[in-house]
Amino acid sequence: MSDNLALHGTTILCLKKNEEIIIAADGQVSHGNTVLKSTARKLRTIANNKIIVGFAGSTADGLALFEKLEIKIEQYNSNLLRSAVELAKDWRNDKYLRRLEAMMIVADRSHILILTGNGDVIEPENNIAAIGSGGLFALSAARALMSYENNLTAEEIALKSMNIAADLCVFSNHNIIMEKVV
């Protein structure tokens, strides 16, 4: 995929509040400045719904990485951190995987991780992670809401943050899908 806008044209947000972990994604698939689909599912669950994955970037590349992560999760008995590190090593060292244009947020009860195309595994300090073109908008909104709106649930914060991101990012929309880590 040669168009950089298509690479980052989405919003994925994950946050943890009061032991509740929510991951949310918009539904828009864009290529350049064209909307191809508005109801895409960018979230997947694995390990009996104990791990949720959201991806941004090329859809095919995101699905390929999801499949690789699923294999690692099975290989390492649902140990998310170990599986993510092993996937990142493969991603960095494999000639084919290095060309994949995608990022992922993965979460279980213990960890929220961002996996980048450079082979990075990043665990955010404040229990909020976001990727994609609308990621910084969603991240900023979630941080503000977490700080000043103590009465909101994780799900309410995620929905409000995603809607703010969709208002500001032309490559994201208001068709928000959310999953809760069980």
Curated annotation (Swiss-Prot):
Active site per the UniProt annotation: 10
Predominant subcellular localization, coarse grouping: cytoplasm
Domain of life, per lineage: Bacteria
Control of this protein's activity: Allosterically activated by HslU binding.
Localization annotation: Cytoplasm
EC number: 3.4.25.2
Reactions accelerated catalytically: ATP-dependent cleavage of peptide bonds with broad specificity
GO CC entries: HslUV protease complex; proteasome core complex
Keywords, comma-separated and alphabetical: Allosteric enzyme, Cytoplasm, Hydrolase, Metal-binding, Protease, Sodium, Threonine protease
CDD domains registered for this protein in UniProt: protease_HslV
UniProt-listed Pfam families: Proteasome
HAMAP family: HslV
Its job: Protease subunit of a proteasome-like degradation complex believed to be a general protein degrading machinery.
UniProt similarity note: Belongs to the peptidase T1B family. HslV subfamily.
Subunit structure of this chain's protein: A double ring-shaped homohexamer of HslV is capped on each side by a ring-shaped HslU homohexamer. The assembly of the HslU/HslV complex is dependent on binding of ATP.
Name of the molecule in the record: ATP-dependent protease subunit HslV
Species this chain originates from: Rickettsia typhi (strain ATCC VR-144 / Wilmington)
Lineage: Bacteria, Pseudomonadati, Pseudomonadota, Alphaproteobacteria, Rickettsiales
Gene: hslV
